């Protein structure tokens, strides 16, 4: 059984030099993938107020905006140039932030910088302040999902046209849990699906994706399932084995500034290395 561990190094609330140290330290520890986030404003989350919702995984009870923040796509290129082994990506790029043809070109370029390690992570965004701060319309969730459905084929088509093309198959990760539109896009196009929330929600959403894959004629097993392993925020069971039982083989932790502590990363890597082959 192959289980891989990802780490989202949040590009907020700290200095770039410390963030770079986190990337290299995580690579040395054996992390399989490094991710960033794509926000235009830093978030300050009141963890004591965090609540869970069946539809969307986690709803931050009190989220303030403010503090240091770095732009996500530039961070991806920096991670690609700084490291040599882990896969590189973002969880995830809100689809409305960039022209889809440009986003494909950016992804292809970082794929070459990383020597073929890039994952293109897409979603619909959720933080109103991100959109409004930079002058983007904060559309309804349904409209953003329709934008995702429209733009993903454009991105895939542009990747085929670029010269040079990506170095190999460039995996497409989609983080969407809307059953009417977003998850159908996952069934049709995604190589990786990032699902999140309490285990009961994850279990139910996996069954929905199985049904949607049947409807579009896609083999469900072609899609790699990923989730956040973030018990301190989501109030989850600390036991990562509950996700393996649902077929999830890629667990993504989060390290936050200003120090980007890797203590939990060390623990989960020790668990991964103890698993039977």
What spans do the regions from the language model cover?
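C-terminal amphipathic alpha-helical "assembly" element
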Residues: 1-32, 111, 115, 119-121, ...
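N-terminal beta1-alpha1-beta2 module of alpha/beta enzyme domains
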Residues: 1-82, 198, 275
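Glycine- and other small-residue-rich loops at beta-strand/loop junctions that grip anionic moieties
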Residues: 11, 65-68, 92-95, 174-175, ...
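Internal, glycine-rich beta/alpha segment that forms the wall or movable "lid"
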Residues: 44-46, 58-60, 90, 96-189, ...
């Amino acid at each position: 059984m192959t289980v891989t561990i990802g780490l989202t190094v949040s590009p907020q609330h700290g200095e770039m030099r410390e963030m770079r140290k986190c990337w290299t330290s995580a690579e040395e520890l054996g992390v399989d993938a490094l991710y960033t986030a794509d926000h235009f404003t830093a978030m300050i989350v009141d963890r004591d107020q965090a609540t869970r919702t069946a539809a969307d995984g986690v709803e931050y009870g009190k989220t303030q905006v403010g503090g240091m923040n770095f732009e996500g796509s530039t961070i991806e290129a920096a991670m690609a140039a700084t490291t040599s082994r882990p896969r590189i990506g973002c969880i995830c790029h809100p689809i409305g932030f960039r022209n889809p043809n440009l986003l494909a070109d950016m992804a292809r370029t970082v794929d070459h910088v990383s020597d073929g390690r890039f994952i293109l992570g897409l979603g619909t965004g959720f933080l109103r302040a991100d959109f409004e701060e930079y002058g983007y319309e904060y559309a309804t969730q349904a409209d953003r999902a329709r934008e995702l459905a429209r733009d993903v084929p454009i991105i895939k088509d542009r990747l085929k046209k670029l010269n040079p093309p990506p170095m190999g198959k460039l995996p497409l990760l989609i983080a969407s849990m809307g059953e009417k539109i977003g998850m159908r896009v996952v069934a049709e196009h995604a190589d990786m699906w990032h699902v999140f929330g309490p285990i009961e929600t994850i279990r139910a959403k996996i069954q929905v994706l199985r049904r949607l894959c049947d409807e579009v004629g896609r083999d469900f097993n072609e899609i790699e399932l990923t989730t956040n392993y973030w018990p301190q925020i989501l109030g989850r069971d600390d036991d990562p084995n509950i996700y393996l039982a649902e077929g999830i083989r890629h667990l993504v932790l989060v390290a936050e500034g200003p120090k980007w502590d890797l203590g939990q990363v060390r623990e989960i890597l020790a668990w991964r290395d103890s698993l039977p082959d």
